[in-house]
């Protein structure tokens, strides 16, 4: 792809990056989920948006109008939005795909410089993070990679030589054959498209033997009304949703604490309609402070596995 002679770059540590090859490259350190929730979800939550989700074949002019509104949220003049760092809401993704919004989802690690999987928006498959990038080889460590999730392993020229002066840590992540073990679970279809399910260390195993990937449930819950962030934990073999509400939004709409509690319970009921029987959420617990985060802004899950109350 041609890149213009004059390109302006505004750089920060990205969770969402806008590539504007025409004139501008931007990267955002802000949580992209909030951007989409505040500005894109309202486009879906109306008659036209709901029609698009039900009927893929609609008037091109309607699609173009919806696409322009969505693109204007990000300034309008860009070639592609690259999303990464957290699961993407399925309804939002399907809507963006149907209106031809130029987004793609990438997967990577700092240790791989950092992209492992990515595809141009025109070819990206729904729910996937694309295919192995150039000079990278990607496999799923599973007896049936298309249907049974396994660990993503990769190797190639993008891979680091190792952690500086830490051979022990290097040997724990890169095996003797040069494969880096990411710790992420995924499936891969026959065309090589990778769909991430979650972190292996985060997977929940019920007494009935069901594997539950909490990130998949959280991505749905985080896009529901007045939810800022959430965690799904297993307590006494039952799934519990820990929710930090968007108090500013709730109070702006005149909600009191009892109203927020009712809204969270309504979210639980709606969420359960979207989930299989073995993933049903039995209880919601409200947190009044943000969850503790790592330096990479990931929630410190280990601190909340024993849900109180």
Label each region the model flagged.
Residues 13, 17, 21, 29-124, ...:
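Gly/Ser/Thr-rich phosphate-binding loop
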Residues 127-132, 177:
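Short Gly/Pro-enriched turn/cap motifs at secondary-structure boundaries
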Residues 156, 161-162, 185-277, 290:
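AMP-binding/adenylate-forming catalytic core of the ANL superfamily
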Residues 244, 286-308:
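Flexible lysine-rich "adenylation lid" loop at the C-terminal edge of ANL adenylation domains
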């Amino acid at each position: 792809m041609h890149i213009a002679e004059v390109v302006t770059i505004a750089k920060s540590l990205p969770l969402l990056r806008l590539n504007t090859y025409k004139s501008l490259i931007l990267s955002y350190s802000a949580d992209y989920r909030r951007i989409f929730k505040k500005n894109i979800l309202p486009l879906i939550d109306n008659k036209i948006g709901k029609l698009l989700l039900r009927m893929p074949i609609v008037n091109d002019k309607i699609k173009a109008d919806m696409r322009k509104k969505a693109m204007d949220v990000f300034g309008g003049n860009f070639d592609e939005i690259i999303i990464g760092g957290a699961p993407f809401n399925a309804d939002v993704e399907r809507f963006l795909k149907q209106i031809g919004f130029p987004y793609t989802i990438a997967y990577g690690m700092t240790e791989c410089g950092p992209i492992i999987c990515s595809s141009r928006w025109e070819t990206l498959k729904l729910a996937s993070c694309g295919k192995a990038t150039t000079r990278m080889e990607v496999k799923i460590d599973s007896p049936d990679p298309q249907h049974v999730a396994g660990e993503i392993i990769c190797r190639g020229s993008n891979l680091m030589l190792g952690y500086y002066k830490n051979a022990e840590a290097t040997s724990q992540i890169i095996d003797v054959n040069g494969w880096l073990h990411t710790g992420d679970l995924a499936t891969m279809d026959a065309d090589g498209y990778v769909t991430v399910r979650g972190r292996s260390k985060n997977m929940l195993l019920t007494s009935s033997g069901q594997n539950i990937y909490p990130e998949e449930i959280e991505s749905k819950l985080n896009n529901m009304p007045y939810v800022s962030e959430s965690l799904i934990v297993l307590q006494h073999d039952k799934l519990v949703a820990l929710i930090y509400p968007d108090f500013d939004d709730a109070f702006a709409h005149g909600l009191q604490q009892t109203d927020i509690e009712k809204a969270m319970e309504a979210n639980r009921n709606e969420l359960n309609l979207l989930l299989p029987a073995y993933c049903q959420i039995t209880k919601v617990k409200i947190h009044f402070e943000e969850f503790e985060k790592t330096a990479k802004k990931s929630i410190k899950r280990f601190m909340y596995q024993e849900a109180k109350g």
